[in-house]
C-alpha cells in the first residue's frame, strides 16, 4: 500500500488555524501546535462568554436602575414592585436606557411606582 502524505488538506487545515490565531502573542500566532491549542481555548471562551454576556448586561441594567431609583427615593425592588402593581411592563433594558438618557421620564415612572406600592 503506498504512503499517503497530507498534502493540500493538511496545509489548508493548518493555514485555517494560523489564520484564526492571527493577532495572538508570540508563538501562539505562528506555530501550528501552540496556535491550535490557543484557538481551541479561545473558542471555548467565546462559547462561555456568549452566555455570560447576557448575565453581565442584566447586572448592568439592574445597577443603573437601582442608582436612578435611589435618586428618586426608592430602592430597586420597591420600584419594580410598584411598576408591576401599576401594570407597567417595561423591561430592564428599557428602564436602564430611560434612567441614563431621559431622567424626567424615569422620574415619572418612579412616582407612578411610589403611588402603587401597598
UniProtKB/Swiss-Prot annotation:
Listed InterPro entries: Ribosomal_bL20, RIBOSOMAL_L20_CS, Ribosomal_protein_bL20_C
GO cellular component: ribonucleoprotein complex; ribosome
One GO term of the biological process aspect: translation
Pfam families the record matches: Ribosomal_L20
Role summary: Binds directly to 23S ribosomal RNA and is necessary for the in vitro assembly process of the 50S ribosomal subunit. It is not involved in the protein synthesizing functions of that subunit.
HAMAP family linked: Ribosomal_bL20 (MF_00382)
Name under which the protein is recorded: Large ribosomal subunit protein bL20
Organism: Bacillus mycoides (strain KBAB4) (Bacillus weihenstephanensis)
Primary gene name: rplT
